[in-house]
Amino acid sequence: MTKKKAFTPILYLSFIVFLPWWIYFSFNKCLGSWITNWWNTRESEIFLNDLQEKSILEKLIELEEFLFVDEILKKNSETHPQEFHTGIHKEAIQFIKIQNESYIHMILRLSTNLICVVIISGFYIWRNETLVILNSWSREFLYNLSDTVKVFSILLLTDLCIGFHSPHGWELMIGSIYQDFGFVQNDRIISGLVSTFPVILDTILKYWIFRYLNRVSPSLVVIYHSIND
């Protein structure tokens, strides 16, 4: 009975960690090819937003200009204008199919994210006692660590997340969130978030760390400041 109680939280934690990848893989394997074929067969003209529509139109214009210049450089081939327009049409269809596939994958990612949130929320409500066991395990693990290891772990995590060398990681994370929700990446918005959000998070974490260390053990505050300096 004790082994079963110990195994259940581990299974629950593994389920939460691997659930998003499993759902995305299943959706992509079962529905990805079918949705792609249906979308391309129906020649859908749906765009997710105005920015993406503008981006596709600009790329199609660039493609037409590139093919036009390429035909000018190949004057000796004497390509017929009708063949030139046919080539543009084929390239445009191929380009739109590639764009449609990226949109479909984006929709699948967004759908799996929403499904994962719903399932995890349901498990949080349904298996609340399992979360209590996980919480007690984590607290026991933290209490068994020495003061120096606790402070070192806190400094390592804060430096990795909000240190001076972490802006590139924030850019990648915010960019991936943009892609998951179907937004076109805007460098100005991303740079603004990277320059402001970590600062706010750093202030909140420092305040929380000070209160936590001061409540657990005042000696931890001294060790924290000594290592941090």
From Swiss-Prot:
Subcellular location(s) of the protein: Plastid membrane
Catalysed conversion reaction: K(+)(in) + H(+)(out) = K(+)(out) + H(+)(in)
Keyword Lyase listed: no
Residues that span the membrane, as ranges: 7-27, 106-126, 189-209
Keywords of this entry: Hydrogen ion transport, Ion transport, Membrane, Plastid, Transmembrane, Transmembrane helix, Transport
Main subcellular location: plastid
Protein's membrane topology: Multi-pass membrane protein
Alphabetized Pfam families for the sequence: CemA (PF03040)
The keyword ATP-binding is assigned to this record: no
GO cellular component: plastid membrane
Gene Ontology terms describing biological process: proton transmembrane transport
Functional description taken from the UniProt entry: May be involved in proton extrusion.
UniProt record similarity statement: Belongs to the CemA family.
HAMAP family with a match to the protein in the record: CemA_PxcA
Name under which the protein is recorded: Potassium/proton antiporter CemA
Naturally occurring in which organism (per UniProt): Cuscuta exaltata
